[in-house]
Regions:
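Membrane-interface junctions at the ends of membrane-embedded or membrane-associated helices
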Residues: 1-8, 122-124, 170-180
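Hydrophobic alpha-helical segments with strong N-terminal bias
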Residues: 10, 15, 22, 63, ...
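Start-transfer (signal-anchor) and selected internal transmembrane alpha helices
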Residues: 1-27
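Hydrophobic alpha-helical transmembrane segments
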Residues: 10-17, 84, 102, 130-134, ...
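Active-site lumenal/periplasmic loops and adjacent helix-entry segments of GT-C-fold
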Residues: 25-122, 126-160, 167, 188-192
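Membrane-interface transmembrane helices that cradle and orient dolichyl/undecaprenyl
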Residues: 162-180, 186-189
Length: 193
């Protein structure tokens, strides 16, 4: 790649970082995450993983620090891998609201890049890919999952859905060598929700 192309990528990534930070602006203004339907459940999961990471347990199956300390075997039945960024941010900031906001920003940044990549692969048009990534990442459904319902599993699954859809399209209609997109997209969705 030449210098001009690297510069273009750099500016696009800076733009995506700014957009990801704008996504969490309502949280920054109000200072808290709205308590949606699943707030307590997901907050406890994030706190549990954060506590386990602090104590050197990187694969928590039995939840003993949260959920009233009853020894809930939640880690064995509900995917926790995609919650690691939230838990790492929790350990870095020690505030669950800030951790969730930073986690949202992290995954919106990932979504912007994934949607940009698959749209650009399909249509070979960078402007269309950028616009599509913004429209998708700031869609009403994703905003509702984050700021109204606190449906973290659905939010995370929606981040990887475009990759799975592109992979499905590529395998069945266009480019069979792009099967890893389907595998990655579906695996990430399964690990999300």
């Amino acid at each position: 790649m030449n210098h001009k192309k690297y510069k273009k990528i750099f500016y696009r990534e800076i733009f995506f970082i700014v957009l990801a930070l704008l996504f969490i602006l309502p949280l920054a203004i109000h200072g808290f995450v709205p308590a949606g339907d699943d707030w307590k459940y997901h907050a406890n999961r994030i706190l549990e993983i954060a506590c386990n990471i602090k104590r050197g347990n990187f694969f928590p199956m039995m939840y003993t620090y949260t959920f009233k300390r009853i020894g809930y075997l939640l880690g064995a039945f509900y995917p926790w891998l995609m919650l690691l960024p939230f838990s790492i941010f929790k350990n870095m900031t020690s505030n669950i609201n800030v951790a969730i906001g930073l986690g949202y920003a992290f995954y919106i940044f990932i979504a912007l890049n994934l949607v940009y990549h698959v749209t650009n692969k399909l249509f070979k048009n960078e402007n269309q890919a950028i616009l599509t990534s913004i429209v998708y990442s700031f869609s009403g459904y994703i905003l509702t999952d984050c700021f109204k319902r606190m449906a973290l599993g659905e939010f995370l699954a929606m981040i990887f859905l475009p990759v799975a859809v592109y992979g499905f399209y590529a395998v069945f209609f266009d480019n069979k060598k792009d099967w890893p997109y389907l595998a990655f997209g579906m695996s990430a969705i399964i690990l999300s929700h």
